[in-house]
Regions:
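A detector for small-residue-rich transmembrane helices and their helix-helix packing motifs
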Residues: 1-181
Length: 181
């Protein structure tokens, strides 16, 4: 039986909401309703910058990434997935602010750091072992994106991966504690 793809809004409300939100924010920049990209390193600016895409191809790549997360949302369920997304957004924001205090980091915009966080979380939390080939592929993808696009945020992507590792380790620990009870 063929799977009904039209029901994705009901099956994946978190991915759907993020997808629409990012399109709305992009449209606000495209129409000049919003004029400046928040590149300050305070909590609100860094948090907000996750939802900004000023380039159409960057927007499309991140929207495709969000679409690919629907499998993760269906596997975890929307409540756990929302918890993961919120954890990654806030953890990456804090890491970026802390890193900027040590070394001055360039402005990073877009949802790709969060995407890398979810992909890394998925690799580490899904099985009892870590798939180093896929993890290596994420690292190579980050390096390739920086080489091919000078504006690509190496720091934002790496911080996303680190956040995904922490999220997965915390998740596995919680699952282990639950299984003991």
């Amino acid at each position: 039986m063929k799977e009904d793809k039209t029901n994705i809004l009901k099956k994946c409300p978190i991915c759907s909401f993020i997808f629409v939100l990012i399109i709305i924010v992009f449209s606000m920049y495209f129409t000049s309703a919003l004029k400046t990209v928040p590149c300050e390193k305070d909590m609100i600016s860094v948090l907000y910058s996750n939802f900004i895409h000023t380039d159409f191809y960057h927007l499309l790549a991140n929207l495709f990434g969000i679409y690919s997360l629907t499998n993760v949302e269906m596997r975890l369920g929307s409540k756990k997935f929302l918890t993961l997304i919120l954890f990654l957004i806030f953890f990456t924001t804090l890491l970026e602010i802390l890193l900027n205090k040590i070394i001055k980091t360039p402005c990073s915009i877009g949802f790709s750091g969060i995407l890398y966080g979810v992909f890394t979380f998925e690799i580490i939390s899904k099985d009892k072992y870590v798939d180093y080939k896929i993890l290596g592929s994420i690292i190579l993808n980050i390096m390739f994106s920086k080489i091919t696009n000078n504006k690509s945020s190496l720091y934002g992507h790496v911080i996303g991966v680190i956040s995904g590792v922490f999220g997965a380790l915390i998740y596995k620990k919680i699952q282990m504690l639950k299984s003991k009870n």
